């Protein structure tokens, strides 16, 4: 998936536009951008986009992309984006009252490995609940 395809997501387009203007999209915005973009773009391109915004340089951008890819973080859910809005000045989701917005899983066609990872996590969560254990850590 190319950059143009990422722009089909209004949420990702908002982040891309803000980065292009050199804005600070906040730590959660950078994490959201990296966790999505790293699934669709070469790592070097994700780093270059993160460097455009204020709030971090090349070292921080490379470290974030490495962390996201090595740990296999999945893109955040809509609810998580709404939680992120409360934690920082830059609003990742500018329309929190509209339930049809800011859902990355509806806005983009996620790679199969993302869907498989989520399904595996939910199975582990169900099994843990069945056995009366705590849910697996993410």
What are these regions (language model features)?
Residues 1-138:
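Basic, alpha-helical nucleic-acid-binding regions used in initiation and control of genome expression
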